[in-house]
């Protein structure tokens, strides 16, 4: 999923 502030999985 898209975790804004970290990485995009």
Curated annotation (Swiss-Prot):
Main location: secreted
Domain of life the protein comes from: Eukaryota
Entry keyword Secreted: yes
Modified residues (Sulfotyrosine): 4
Compartments (UniProt record): Secreted
Positions where Phenylalanine amide occurs in the chain: 9
A single cellular component GO annotation: extracellular region
InterPro entries according to UniProt: Gastrin/cholecystokinin_CS, Sulfakinin
Biological processes per GO annotation: neuropeptide signaling pathway
Keywords: Amidation, Neuropeptide, Secreted, Sulfation
Keyword Transport applies: no
Family of the protein in this entry: Belongs to the gastrin/cholecystokinin family.
Record's function text: Myotropic peptide.
Name the UniProt record assigns to this protein: Neosulfakinin-1
